[in-house]
Structure formats: C-alpha cells, structure tokens
Amino acid sequence: MLSVIRVHLPSEIPIVGCELTPYVLLRRPDKTPSTDDVPESAPLEGHFLKYRWFRVQSDKKVAICSVHPSETATLQCLGCLKSKVPVAKSYHCSTKCFSDAWQHHRVLHERAASAATEGNDEEELPRLNSSGSGSGVLSTSVSLTNGSSSVYPSAITQKTGAGGETLVEVGRSKTYTPMADDICHVLKFECVVVNAETKQNVGLSCTILTSRVIPAPSPSPRRLISISGTDVTGHLDSNGRPLSMGTFTVLSYNILSDTYASSDIYSYCPTWALAWTYRRQNLLREIVKYRADIVCLQEVQNDHFEEFFLPELDKHGYQGLFKRKTNEVFIGNTNTIDGCATFFRRDRFSHVKKYEVEFNKAAQSLTEAIIPVSQKKNALNRLVKDNVALIVVLEAKFGSQAADNPGKRQLLCVANTHVNVPHELKDVKLWQVHTLLKGLEKIAASADIPMLVCGDFNTVPASAPHTLLAVGKVDPLHPDLMVDPLGILRPHSKLTHQLPLVSAYSQFAKMGGNVITEQQRRRLDPASSEPLFTNCTRDFIGTLDYIFYTADTLTVESLLELLDEESLRKDTALPSPEWSSDHIALLAEFRCMPRARRNNIL
C-alpha cells in the first residue's frame, strides 16, 4: 500500500513571497521508493496523497531583526521611528548588529527626511538631477500567488498544548507561498495517505514545522542620477513612470546562476538567502523595480529562463530572447546550462533581428586555419570555453531626435555577453572580446545604427580586453600580450576596432561637483574612471561588468548610483539577504544623438 516514509523542507526558514516545496519520499505499493506526487485525480491502487498547510498562531507578538531575519529582535532604532522609516527596518538582534548597521541607518534617515520634504511616501527608484534634487520613479510590485493552493477565510481551530495555539488552514496543495499574514508565525505542513473510495485517512499523517516566517529583506533603493545636468524628470506615463523624449534605459546584470551558487563558495550567505526559490523572487523584484526598457542578464539557466523569467517578465510587458551556452565541453545535466537573456519592453521596442555568437565555433575555425595538426587538440582545449554572445537589433517605438525626418526608423543594436574564461588564459579572453567586436563592426558597416555592448567580461579596468573595448587598440607592450602560447594574438597590430565605444559609467567622472556627484566619484577608480567594483565576494572585489555605447550616436543622460563597499560588507559580501547576486546591477539612460551633432563630433 502507498505510504509516506518522510518529509522535509530544503530550508527551515520560510520567507514571504518565496514558494515552499516539501520533499516527500513515498513507498509505492511495490515497495519501491518514489518522490512522484500522487494526486486525487490520479490515485495509485486506490490511494492518493492529501496535503494541508497551517499557520500556527499564538497571542505572543515577535519582532524580527532587520539584518538577520532568522533572529528575534532585542532592540530598536529610535531614529528610524522619528524619521518614519518602515518599522521593520528598525529592529536588531544585538548591540553589535545595530552598531555594524549604523551607517546604513544614517542613509535610511537621510533618504526618509528627503522624501518627507518632497512629500513623496511611495516606495520608489529616486531620480536625481545633477543639482542633487530629485523626483520619484513609481515602482510596481511583483505579484506573488500560491499557485493552485487555496486560502481559506475561516479558521480551522484546535488547541495544541498549553500554549493555546490556533491552527489556521492556509493551503491544500503540496506547495505554499508564505504571505504577509504569516510573518512571525510558524507554518505546519501535513501529508497523509487517503483512501480514494472512502475519503478516509489511512495511517498517521506526516507533519513538519518551519521556523517563523520572515519578510523578504528589502534593499535600500538605488537612485538614478542625471549626468546631463538638465532636468530629466520628464512626464509620467500611465504607470507613473517618467519618460524623457527620445531616451531609453538599459540594465546589465549577472544574476549568479544557481549552478554556481554553492554554499562552499558563498558560506557567508545564509542558506535560505542562497536558495534559488528565494533568490529568484528577490532578483525579480529588483529587476522589475528598475523598469528598464532593455534588460541584459547573464548566467541565466535555460530552465529558469523558460519557466520563470520569461513568463514573469512577460507579465510586466517584456519580450525575451535567450542564447544558451554551447555544450561541446559541458558535462552533466543539460538543463543546468546557463546563457545570456535579453528582454525589452514591448511598448518601447520591437524585435528586428537576432545574431548569435558561439566562441567555440570561432575557436574551431581559428584552429583549423592557423594551428599545426600536432597542436590542434591542445589548442582546442585552451580555446574552447563554451561562451556566447547574444546580439539583438531593435526598433524604437518612441520619438527620437536622431532621425532626420519623422518617418525614419530608429534602430538600436544591443550585444549581451558573458566572457567566462579563467584569469590565467589572458590570450583567450582577449581573443573572444576581439572576435565579438569584429562581429559588431560588420553590423555597423551594414547600417547606421547606435550600439550597446553589455555584459560580464570578467576583465578588470586597464586589462588588455578592457583597453581594446575602451580605446580601440592594445599597446604592443601591454603585459597581457606576453601570454600567447598559440600565437593567436599576432600580429598585435590586428588588435583594433573602429567602433567609438565609451564606458557609460566613466561619465560619472565628467560631472559637475556637488554632494551627490562627489559621492559617486569616490566610488570610481581614478585611473580608469570605472566603478571601483561591480563584483564583491569575500575573496575578490573589483569591476568585471560594463555597459559600453557608441559615443557618436548616443549620449548618457543618467546612471544608476553605485553602491559603497561598506554597506555591502555588513553582510560580509555578495550575495546577501538583500542583494541576491555576487554582482551589482548597472543601469544607464541614453538619448539618441541628432545627426547634426554626430557630424560635429566626427
């Protein structure tokens, strides 16, 4: 007969908005173990499984720490209460916890005071002009549901011991997504075998209790800062979103694939915050809040693209394209191959064309052309690294100043890549970047089209790949060129391109001086004008991610503010409960340049 051997949860700490899926191990009638579901609609030899979720309620109120949400709060920041910061952010579990977070509290107090002065109480992505004043970009909330589970308004009550707790039934499916009403309460999951004919329970039910439900940590909003020195507030669309004529926003974000999110590597991150069920919702909330017109994501697993990001971002008006890594050197489950995903808002752009770059194919062609037969195997082992790039040509649906006449199409080319090559293979990394740029040059030669090159290049400022991108050539004496055992970089004079690429975030260095811009400049590397970091782990901090643009066709209007290391180190490093990737998101607002101004620049 069907029976339940055991049940357990991947994480004992439930978070609001993050689906709970218990692991249920069964013994089938033939005595074999199984984890397959046996619903009432498909009973097994006259029996099926029934699930129920309960909220265990008591009269005792519990506050939880805003930094360590699995811990009970023991003290509260009075400054937060006076500043009308959301009360949940004011709690701490210890004096050390409060002391470590004090600088973060000061930022919260200052922003709350600024918001109160402007009369804006909405949760928002603030937009600041170069004088330091700002207005809000209205954010939208991510809709979270319990799938097929039901919420029952009437309580099923029963006393459970001397504490007088009450069980409130909240769901009847295998999975359950905690809601705000569950915060600070324990959840109880119950699984029992039921006779399909009599509807009576067979044997004892298996139950499991969770820890107290905690709210999803809420990162402090990052501000959008004007670079142009003009008022970028613009007009609000029907969703309350500022729009400047002829401008658009681009987000680039390595979201940290679940495949790479190992507790061995990121042992400082709580297991519940490292779990994909939590991270995917936190990442989605962050991405949606930015309301970018174009979103370039790296390290997106193909199953996560199809089953989560594509349908969820579709609800927010995005169309998505995906390029998975090639699998010539992949070993294991093909469902866990990651790649690059590019999304765009359907009301702002339409899809015209897609190009896919597979560096493995380029490596094979290169090997056939220049590598002696005796060295081909070793050459391929060095060159084949499974990386890809996704290049998308879009047509703008909004007004643009770049057109000579109102009827001309405004096209845009967006390249999205992840150059994941070991640090010591400097020749391979530079060769892949050069290969991508040569492909983009061909597209540029066929059309007068603005270009964006986004992604995680895994290369720091002043390295040969970064120099090639930003300067258009590499000095023959650059130390990176010393690593070239296959001779693929020779002659060095070929390491050039003609695209007028500029790093968007380098424009922070050119802004006029005020409190806001000085703060951002302190977060730039003075030598390269690039951010001090876009990747922050316990063992490494540095810049690996970039948004490059063609400076003869586009100008930067605004940039998403950079984060400071101190605020991230309160959780040791990234990822953390607040930020669910080991990288930070980069976002820039661009304006298409009028042709007359292009000619003056040229």
Curated annotation (Swiss-Prot):
Belongs to the CCR4/nocturin family. GO terms for molecular function: metal ion binding; poly(A)-specific ribonuclease activity; RNA binding. Component of the CCR4-NOT complex, at least composed of CRR4 and CAF1 proteins. Its cofactor is Mg(2+). One of its GO terms (cellular component) is P-body. This is Carbon catabolite repressor protein 4 homolog 1. GO terms for biological process: mRNA processing; starch biosynthetic process; sucrose biosynthetic process. It comes from Arabidopsis thaliana (Mouse-ear cress). Disulfide bonds: none annotated. Mg(2+) binds at residue 299. The keyword Transcription regulation applies. Keywords: Cytoplasm, Exonuclease, Hydrolase, Magnesium, Metal-binding, Nuclease, Nucleus, Repeat, RNA-binding, Transcription, Transcription regulation. The lineage of its organism: Eukaryota, Viridiplantae, Streptophyta, Embryophyta, Tracheophyta. It is found in: Nucleus; Cytoplasm. Its EC number is 3.1.13.4. Residues 113-136 are annotated as: Disordered.
